[in-house]
Amino acid sequence: MEPIGRSLQGVTGRPDFQKRLEQMKEKVMKDQDVQAFLKENEEVIDQKMIEKSLNKLYEYIEQSKNCSYCSEDENCNNLLEGYHPKLVVNGRSIDIEYYECPVKRKLDQQKKQQSLMKSMYIQQDLLGATFQQVDISDPSRLAMFQHVTDFLKSYNETGKGKGLYLYGKFGVGKTFMLAAIANELAEKEYSSMIVYVPEFVRELKNSLQDQTLEEKLNMVKTTPVLMLDDIGAESMTSWVRDEVIGTVLQHRMSQQLPTFFSSNFSPDELKHHFTYSQRGEKEEVKAARLMERILYLAAPIRLDGENRRHP
């Protein structure tokens, strides 16, 4: 059997191998970043080190070094995905160290924010809402901004704060505002959940059959910051009012957990909605008790403006 060393000598001594090696070396030495690195370290790097580290230098030039050609929508092609290489001198060799790239940091931050902002049955296009997109020319929006600013300050300092009950005509941007508040919280690394109430109620009714009702209720009861979107649009029954909404709000009130609401109804109109069940039963005391919880948790602000969904 031919010794391995002699076999390797045979391969490396072949003309085609030597040609490829020279082409690789030429490509490496023409690279501007490599040239700059060698010049910067010319006192410690000699030709022998370059020859010894040729494979590392080639690995370096074949990768994106500054993410200038990367897109957030593309997969990273680097050896270590999401990291860019930097040449370093390591003893008598040239080596590569990898650093997290700006694009990866940004995407990781976005994923973290998305994980903090949970939603149930909310349109996906609304979940990217920010206050930078909000028209503040309307006085009602200025009042809302002031309250949100005060809330964030209080929540940051104490973990508590009074939410908002946003009400107004269909399409004036109430859900958008809730999503913007949730994103603002996520930027500060606070968790929240937005729930579209009518669909949530329908799911809870179905959960009576698969015995997941308590689990779903507890998730909404205990989330750090809750936003109930379109309260009052659900089909009103005594069970919905007392066992679902009432139970959730009682827990959140007792634990002082911040809660936000949006509705097409003013507080008085919502009270009327909760007074009458589908059967026509009139229960003013229970409706009043529920409204007390809502107004304890949230300050009412009317949002004015045109219908922004259908110009």
UniProtKB/Swiss-Prot annotation:
GO BP annotation list: DNA replication; DNA replication, synthesis of primer
GO molecular function: ATP binding; ATP hydrolysis activity; DNA binding; metal ion binding
Induction note: Transcribed at constant levels during exponential growth.
InterPro entries listed in its UniProt record: AAA+_ATPase, DnaA_dom, DnaI_N, P-loop_NTPase
Annotated localization: Cytoplasm
Enzyme Commission code: 3.6.4.-
UniProt enzyme class: hydrolase
Superkingdom per UniProt: Bacteria
Consequence recorded when altering residue 76 to A: Partial loss of Zn(2+) binding, still interacts with helicase
Binding site for ATP: 168-175
One Pfam short name: Bac_DnaA
Signal sequence bounds: none
Disruption phenotype: Essential, it cannot be deleted; in depletion experiments DNA replication slows as soon as the protein is degraded and replication stops by 1 hour.
Assembly and binders: The DNA replisome assembles sequentially on oriC in this order; DnaA, DnaD, DnaB, DnaI-DnaC helicase. Monomer with a very minor amount of dimer in solution. Interacts with replicative helicase (from G.stearothermophilus, called DnaB); this interaction is disrupted by DnaD. Interacts with replicative helicase DnaC, forms a DnaC(6):DnaI(6) complex. Interacts with the helicase as 3 dimers. A stable complex with DnaG primase, DnaI(6):helicase(6):DnaG(3) fragment can be isolated; DnaI and DnaG do not contact each other (helicase and DnaG in this complex are derived from G.stearothermophilus).
Protein family: Belongs to the DnaI family.
Protein name per its UniProtKB record: Replicative helicase loader DnaI
Organism: Bacillus subtilis (strain 168)
High-level lineage: Bacteria, Bacillati, Bacillota, Bacilli, Bacillales
Gene it is expressed from: dnaI
